[in-house]
Amino acid sequence: MKLAGVELNVQGLDFLDREGKIVPALKDARVRQALNYAIDKDALSKVLGGGKGRPVSTQFLPGSDGYDATLDSYYNYDVAKAKQLLTDAGFANGFELTILSAPFLGFDTLSQAVASYWQAIGVKTTIDSKPSVAEFLTGLSSGKYGGAVAGLGATTPTLITYNCCFKPGSAWNPSKTPVPDLQAIIAKLAATDATQAGPVAKQVNKYITEQALFVPVLATKLYFLYSPKISGVTPTATEASPNILNIVPAQ
């Protein structure tokens, strides 16, 4: 048998409280950056990805116009730097944070692993696991959590990704927190011809990554197992399920 796969998902956490209404520390970008630096993403990608995960520091994957390979390792594991950033932000003694999680898709395992790394820099994390999708989604929009576990790999055009995941009021920004600098780049992107959008889309990725609006941990693939007697099983970022019309007997 043969195996074909394409990266479609980034497992990590989303900061739901970027204004610091529930967890004041999260309003400071240095704190969010510290929480990224505190995680050994190389180790987690090997363990949680079944040996096939890839450590990442960005939500954007190959196939998206905003993908920038140079950002993939932006937050390399650095506990000393994480602690210094917390100190600089006024949280040398850490703080407490509650994360919304769920038992499906390996979310609880990821949450627990991340929490153990955060504990090492003084951040006490409580995991509130919801047993069903409905309860998880209710919690996501409740305004009660500082963050939530997420699976949000962006392979679509950046404008679509923004409207889905970053725009104030979207599912992953339920607090409707405005981000003026990001919105200015988005406005520029919307006014740019699609054939020339790449450089501007990468600016969106750069801003989201540098401001640590998320905690990406690892990228995972969607795999297809198929017989060597056929060919044309070539999933892509824009067409994850192979087109059945392209599947033909192997020559």
Where are these regions (language model features)?
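Extracellular/periplasmic solute-recognition and catalytic clefts
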Residues: 1-22
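Envelope-exposed proteins and targeting segments
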Residues: 9-11, 95, 121, 213
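Detector for C-terminal structural segments
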Residues: 11, 36-67, 105-115, 138-251
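Short helix-loop capping/hinge motifs at secondary-structure junctions, enriched
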Residues: 19-31
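Structural transition elements
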Residues: 22, 54-88, 106-107
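Short, conserved helix/loop micro-motifs enriched in His/Cys and acidic residues
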Residues: 64, 87-101
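A local structural motif
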Residues: 92-98, 116-130
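Short helix-initiation/N-cap motifs at beta->coil->alpha
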Residues: 102-105, 127-138
